[in-house]
């Protein structure tokens, strides 16, 4: 167990001193930025709203639901 801790300390110290550390920490940062919103669950509502806006302003949509349009714009008042 102590050997693992020692190797982990050596590895982290190596990353802090070398140029490869930038790529490693960048990868960990990107991974954390993707994981945190998915754990919280805030990303689902954002994608749902984005999809609703895309559907609302679809130029090929023939039947435009005016009640849905009024509901959408009432959110901004």
From Swiss-Prot:
Top-level division of the source organism's lineage: Eukaryota
Removed propeptide positions: 49-77
Signal peptide: 1-23
GO biological process: defense response to bacterium; defense response to fungus; killing of cells of another organism
Compartment(s) where it occurs, according to its Swiss-Prot or TrEMBL record: Secreted; Target cell membrane
Tissue-wise expression: Expressed by the venom gland.
Keywords: Antibiotic, Antimicrobial, Cleavage on pair of basic residues, Cytolysis, Fungicide, Membrane, Secreted, Signal, Target cell membrane, Target membrane
Cellular component, GO annotation: extracellular region; membrane; other organism cell membrane
Function: Antimicrobial peptide with potent activity against Gram-positive bacteria S.aureus (MIC=10 uM) and S.agalactiaea (MIC=15 uM), and Gram-negative bacteria E.coli (MIC=24 uM) and P.aeruginosa (MIC=15 uM), as well as against yeasts Candida albicans (MIC=3.1 uM) and C.glabrata (MIC=25 uM). Also elicits low hemolysis on human erythrocytes (HC(50)=167 uM).
Family: Belongs to the non-disulfide-bridged peptide (NDBP) superfamily. Medium-length antimicrobial peptide (group 3) family.
Protein name, as recorded: VpAmp2.0
Organism of provenance: Mesomexovis punctatus
């Amino acid at each position: 167990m102590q050997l693992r801790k020692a190797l982990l300390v050596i590895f982290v110290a190596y990353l802090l001193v070398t140029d490869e550390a930038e790529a490693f920490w960048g990868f960990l940062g990107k991974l954390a930025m993707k994981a945190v919103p998915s754990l919280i669950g805030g990303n689902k509502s954002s994608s749902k709203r984005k999809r609703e806006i895309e559907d609302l302003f679809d130029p090929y949509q023939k039947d435009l639901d005016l009640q849905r349009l009024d509901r959408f714009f009432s959110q901004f008042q």
